[in-house]
Structures are given as C-alpha cells and as structure tokens.
C-alpha cells in the first residue's frame, strides 16, 4: 500500500485506530475541538511500540520472524519528537485536523526483525501467511499491514522537525534482556 496521508480518513481501513478516529469525527460533528495525532511506533532505547512485544515473542519462540519478504513498513518516531508534536498541535493546530507523528515514513519489517535478531542473538527468518497466527499471536493482524505514513503535511502546517534518533538506532542500543516478557 501507499503512505497514509493526514487528510484521508477511511472508515473501512483495517488499522484498529479507526475506532478512535470515528469517535473523534462524531465529536467534531457536535462542535468539539478535536485534533488527532496518529501515532507510529513510538520508540526510545527502552520501548518501541508494538516492536517491544514482538521482541519478547521472538525470545519465547527462539527466532525473530517477519512475513514473506518483510517489505511491509511501519512508520516510527522518537518519543521526544512525538512529545514536541503534541505541544505544537495544541498550540498551533487546527480543529478537526489529523497529524502524523512519523519521524520516519516507513521502516521495513525485515529491517526491524534483523535489528531485533542482532540485539538478541536470535536467528531471523521469513514465515508464510499460514504461520502468522501461530507465531505472532495477538499481533498477527499487524504483521501484514503496510503502515507507512507521510509527515509532509504535518511538518508544513506545524513546523515540526523530528530530530531524535531513528528506530533502527534505538533498536541497536536497546537492552533486550530487560524487556517485559523477555
């Protein structure tokens, strides 16, 4: 799929966040000032969104897996950049606007898996669609989603400039032995 854009609200999209966006749209229709921040994989060297439980699952399974060629993407942003965006959205944002907190438009699943593999010392492998539910468990619905997101509009409207470390840098510095569930 293509990059998610801030000006698009697709009520049939498979991303679970659609429920909060629809609730926000209903409030906007009633005159409430709502500003939506679409969060990516928010990370630092201690946690990384859905990647943290993915790393814990890899330790339990004895291998790090990604679906198919690993070409699906997850947008990402350092926690300090996301915090700055919340402030900008409150101070300068427009009622009803949606903003993407994407410091990076999309990091491939394979790159993430390889970083986890290097950090944990576990082998990295591709799995088939048939094995996704078994390996990923509750995270299976996310394994095949291409969740890249553009931040061009957000940057232009709010002057937001992400400056924090990128996802792969934080994953390289993460202490995987300290992860919850590891």
Please state what every model-predicted region is.
Residues 22-45:
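Conserved beta-loop-beta element that borders a ligand/cofactor-binding pocket
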Residues 80-88, 114, 168, 172:
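Amphipathic alpha-helical segments that line or abut small-molecule/effector binding pockets
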Residues 1-15, 22, 29-30:
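Active-site "gating" loop of Rossmann-like NAD(P)-dependent oxidoreductase/epimerase domains
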Residues 18, 43-54, 88-99:
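Glycine/proline-rich active-site loop of Rossmann-fold NAD(P)-dependent oxidoreductases
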Residues 56-77, 81, 85:
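A conserved pocket-lining segment of Rossmann-fold NAD(P)-dependent short-chain dehydrogenase/reductase
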